[in-house]
């Protein structure tokens, strides 16, 4: 268990950063390339642990994949060309891999067993296995399909019209991917619109997808045709430096090639509402996944209330938003964020516990947290508990704190941002 010591930053963070590739888009590009016909080239791929797990799983199913840094080529097998894996498919720490891949495996006529690490073993799978069972898939797991390992024997599926109790892109994507080989039209309706990378990328691979409000539909029997994918920078990774630029005194940062998919930019809306000073310069208008360069500098923030439809658009950014709120004048309330409880850690409890160790005034609620600003943070020993987003949030907090901050289990950041600590060090010089 590696630890990392963060020293206070006295002269701000300054410089340009090229944000690493979007994790959600990188996963999907590999998966869709694997079930497409032809060769897909992916540029800007995120070579983090989670996305490498996706590559490993599809290689195990006979797909020819070559990865060289942030460039990947995938020679697709088509929807019917995957081979039965000889070994257990290990997703590591990746919830995206196991949930989306389950949708693909559900319609593939062979047996597979899927598992991950200790964190994955605690994460709820029934939200995916239940609708897939309704479509006719033969899926089982611990506690009646609630937890991994999952066993899947795929086969002929029937389309369903599914109303999801949660706004989850992973649930929606698993059902849509299963629907590619189902008989009829598959429809998924959500309580709020979740991130739409799957819909956008399916369209780029030639699949017709219909969107009507909170409902997404596709007809079975459609094939994917290989295409080249340019992955923009991950806005969830950018969020740590956006907040750092806003709250660490004397900072000015230029974040290059940040993905600006409107289902993901809740962090931008929240920082604007809190009073942050930044500019957004679009760089690839018209692309299926928009991107921009963002310049942000230190400013005074004010507390706000965050809840409702915006939550699915910033669910992964809430840990670092909570940190921003500790430096804002007044009270910030985050609500409607129950999903935080079933992430890599229970992020409500983890954020509150670790920021409290640093001197923040913050309390947990059933569906979020209340943060009382403005807090002077003091260095301490804290822990990521194996959660990459907690680790990066604590590193930014350490830059602000008086005295050194030691982060235990710091290597977790490699899941989504392998070069995070090197970038942070470079920007402090």
UniProtKB/Swiss-Prot annotation:
<feature type="binding site">
    <location>
        <position position="23"/>
    </location>
    <ligand>
        <name>3-phosphoshikimate</name>
    </ligand>
</feature>
<comment type="function">
    <text>Catalyzes the transfer of the enolpyruvyl moiety of phosphoenolpyruvate (PEP) to the 5-hydroxyl of shikimate-3-phosphate (S3P) to produce enolpyruvyl shikimate-3-phosphate and inorganic phosphate.</text>
</comment>
<feature type="binding site">
    <location>
        <position position="347"/>
    </location>
    <ligand>
        <name>phosphoenolpyruvate</name>
    </ligand>
</feature>
<feature type="binding site">
    <location>
        <position position="170"/>
    </location>
    <ligand>
        <name>phosphoenolpyruvate</name>
    </ligand>
</feature>
<dbReference type="Pfam" id="PF00275">
    <property type="entry name" value="EPSP_synthase"/>
</dbReference>
<dbReference type="InterPro" id="IPR006264">
    <property type="entry name" value="EPSP_synthase"/>
</dbReference>
<dbReference type="GO" id="GO:0003866">
    <property type="term" value="F:3-phosphoshikimate 1-carboxyvinyltransferase activity"/>
</dbReference>
<comment type="similarity">
    <text>Belongs to the EPSP synthase family.</text>
</comment>
<keyword id="KW-0808">Transferase</keyword>
<dbReference type="InterPro" id="IPR001986">
    <property type="entry name" value="Enolpyruvate_Tfrase_dom"/>
</dbReference>
<feature type="binding site">
    <location>
        <position position="168"/>
    </location>
    <ligand>
        <name>3-phosphoshikimate</name>
    </ligand>
</feature>
<comment type="subunit">
    <text>Monomer.</text>
</comment>
<dbReference type="GO" id="GO:0009073">
    <property type="term" value="P:aromatic amino acid family biosynthetic process"/>
</dbReference>
<feature type="binding site">
    <location>
        <position position="343"/>
    </location>
    <ligand>
        <name>3-phosphoshikimate</name>
    </ligand>
</feature>
<feature type="binding site">
    <location>
        <position position="24"/>
    </location>
    <ligand>
        <name>3-phosphoshikimate</name>
    </ligand>
</feature>
<feature type="binding site">
    <location>
        <position position="389"/>
    </location>
    <ligand>
        <name>phosphoenolpyruvate</name>
    </ligand>
</feature>
<dbReference type="InterPro" id="IPR013792">
    <property type="entry name" value="RNA3'P_cycl/enolpyr_Trfase_a/b"/>
</dbReference>
<feature type="active site" description="Proton acceptor">
    <location>
        <position position="316"/>
    </location>
</feature>
<protein>
    <recommendedName>
        <fullName>3-phosphoshikimate 1-carboxyvinyltransferase</fullName>
        <ecNumber>2.5.1.19</ecNumber>
    </recommendedName>
</protein>
<feature type="binding site">
    <location>
        <position position="23"/>
    </location>
    <ligand>
        <name>phosphoenolpyruvate</name>
    </ligand>
</feature>
<dbReference type="InterPro" id="IPR023193">
    <property type="entry name" value="EPSP_synthase_CS"/>
</dbReference>
<feature type="binding site">
    <location>
        <position position="123"/>
    </location>
    <ligand>
        <name>phosphoenolpyruvate</name>
    </ligand>
</feature>
<dbReference type="GO" id="GO:0009423">
    <property type="term" value="P:chorismate biosynthetic process"/>
</dbReference>
<feature type="binding site">
    <location>
        <position position="170"/>
    </location>
    <ligand>
        <name>3-phosphoshikimate</name>
    </ligand>
</feature>
<dbReference type="GO" id="GO:0008652">
    <property type="term" value="P:amino acid biosynthetic process"/>
</dbReference>
<feature type="binding site">
    <location>
        <position position="28"/>
    </location>
    <ligand>
        <name>3-phosphoshikimate</name>
    </ligand>
</feature>
<dbReference type="GO" id="GO:0005737">
    <property type="term" value="C:cytoplasm"/>
</dbReference>
<keyword id="KW-0057">Aromatic amino acid biosynthesis</keyword>
<dbReference type="InterPro" id="IPR036968">
    <property type="entry name" value="Enolpyruvate_Tfrase_sf"/>
</dbReference>
<feature type="binding site">
    <location>
        <position position="316"/>
    </location>
    <ligand>
        <name>3-phosphoshikimate</name>
    </ligand>
</feature>
<keyword id="KW-0963">Cytoplasm</keyword>
<comment type="pathway">
    <text>Metabolic intermediate biosynthesis; chorismate biosynthesis; chorismate from D-erythrose 4-phosphate and phosphoenolpyruvate: step 6/7.</text>
</comment>
<keyword id="KW-0028">Amino-acid biosynthesis</keyword>
<feature type="binding site">
    <location>
        <position position="95"/>
    </location>
    <ligand>
        <name>phosphoenolpyruvate</name>
    </ligand>
</feature>
